[in-house]
Design a protein with these regions (language model features):
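C-terminal all-alpha effector/ligand-binding and dimerization domain
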Residues: 11, 116-123, 128, 163, ...
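Amphipathic alpha-helical repeat elements characteristic of tetratricopeptide repeat
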Residues: 17, 93, 109, 113-116, ...
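Hydrophobic packing residues in well-ordered alpha-helices of helical domains and bundles
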Residues: 88, 115, 134, 138, ...
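Residue-level recognition of alpha-helical structural elements
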Residues: 84, 108-111, 130-134, 150, ...
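Amphipathic alpha-helical dimerization/coiled-coil segments
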Residues: 96-124
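Mobile beta-alpha loop/short-helix "lid" or hinge segments that flank ligand
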Residues: 62-68, 159-164, 178-181
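Short linear motifs at protein or domain termini
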Residues: 1-105, 153, 214-219
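Hydrophobic, amphipathic alpha-helical faces that serve as interaction scaffolds
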Residues: 91-107, 139-177
Length: 219
């Protein structure tokens, strides 16, 4: 019996990294839904690879919080309740408001350039209708705001919670990605507030942005 050809062709280098990126992108785009089982043999067949890199990739997803392992049942795309999402947004709002405040204490042209590059990446992703690339650039933007303040403890807190924030953005509101171009514009507006040096307004807007879902920001 001739095996069916793989549906997706993968390069031969760093297969586990490629499989991880493919699966992560599938979760972001909603192709793998919250609660859906991740069957390693089926994923390996579709991608035309052995199960070993798939197993490694799925373990990384579990570590990141994008998947969960259930004993004797297997691995599943993570689900997040409305209550969990709301709690995470409250924590993120506090952290990001303080990050904006501290970033403005030592704002520099290099910080601006880094965030402007993130906004540019978001605009390019929006033009290509690439939700995965936009999510990655979005998260990088906020991480760079935290880094701009130079507070190692704040950065450590962000690093610990970053995968949860990614999970929130991807799974907390899976059916509303919003207008990708508008998402890029929101971040350009946030960057303009930092450039203007208006501490209270920047703190307020970063907090509001982080506390809201894409659907709420779209209203």
């Amino acid at each position: 019996v001739t095996a069916d050809p793989p549906e997706v062709r993968m390069n031969t280098e760093l297969l586990s990294d490629q499989v991880h990126r493919h699966l992560r992108g599938s979760i972001v785009r909603g192709e793998l839904a919250p609660g859906q089982r991740l069957v390693e043999s089926e994923i390996a067949r579709r991608l035309g690879v052995s199960q070993a890199p798939v197993r490694d990739a799925v373990k990384r997803l579990v570590h990141e919080g994008l998947a969960v392992y259930q004993a004797r049942r297997g691995n599943y795309v993570a689900e997040i309740s409305e209550e969990e999402a709301a709690a995470a947004r409250r924590v993120r709002a506090v952290l990001e408001a303080e990050a904006a405040r501290q970033a403005l204490e030592s704002w520099s042209s290099s910080a601006h350039q880094l965030l402007a590059a993130d906004v540019g990446a978001m605009r390019a992703a929006a033009a290509a209708d690439d939700a995965f690339a936009l999510r990655e650039a979005d998260l990088a933007f906020h991480r760079h705001v935290v880094e701009a303040g130079g507070n190692a403890y704040l950065l450590r807190a962000w690093t610990v919670l970053e995968s949860s924030f990614y999970l929130l953005g991807v799974i907390g509101d899976p059916f509303h990605l919003g207008d990708l171009g508008r998402t890029a514009q929101w971040h350009e507006d946030l960057l303009e507030l930092l450039d203007a040096g208006d501490v209270e307004k920047a703190v307020s807007e970063f907090g509001r942005h982080s506390a809201s879902t894409p659907a709420e920001l779209d209203r």
